[in-house]
């Protein structure tokens, strides 16, 4: 697979800017950044309650099964 150099990446960036426009690209990038930030916050918030949760009930309870 061929490697892309700086010149090729610059040409691709110019073509993308011409096709979509700068305002649409900045809007998409902003939405993507907000989504990543919300995801990281949700992952971080999930870890905090797990360490401070109440002790689990006894696991020695008998499990009823219908056969």
Swiss-Prot record:
Signal peptide: none
InterPro entries reported in the protein's UniProt record: TatA/B/E, TatA/E
UniProt-annotated location(s): Cell membrane
Topology in membrane: Single-pass membrane protein
Gene Ontology BP annotations: protein transport by the Tat complex
GO molecular function terms noted in the UniProt entry: protein transmembrane transporter activity
Main location: membrane
Membrane-crossing segments per the record: 1-21
Keyword entries, A-Z: Cell membrane, Membrane, Protein transport, Translocation, Transmembrane, Transmembrane helix, Transport
Cellular component GO terms held in the UniProt record: TAT protein transport complex
Gene3D superfamilies cross-referenced by the UniProt entry: 1.20.5.3310
Region annotated Disordered, chain positions: 45-67
Subunit structure: Forms a complex with TatC.
Annotated NCBIfam families: tatAE
Summary of the function given for this chain in its UniProt record: Part of the twin-arginine translocation (Tat) system that transports large folded proteins containing a characteristic twin-arginine motif in their signal peptide across membranes. TatA could form the protein-conducting channel of the Tat system.
Protein family according to the UniProt entry: Belongs to the TatA/E family.
Descriptive protein name: Sec-independent protein translocase protein TatA
Organism: Roseiflexus sp. (strain RS-1)
């Amino acid at each position: 697979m061929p490697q892309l150099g700086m010149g090729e990446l610059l040409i691709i960036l110019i073509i993308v800017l011409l096709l979509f426009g700068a305002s649409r690209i900045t809007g998409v990038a902003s939405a993507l950044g907000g989504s990543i930030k919300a995801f990281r916050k949700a992952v971080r918030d999930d870890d905090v309650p797990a360490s401070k949760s109440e002790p689990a009930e006894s696991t020695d309870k008998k499990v009823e099964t219908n056969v």
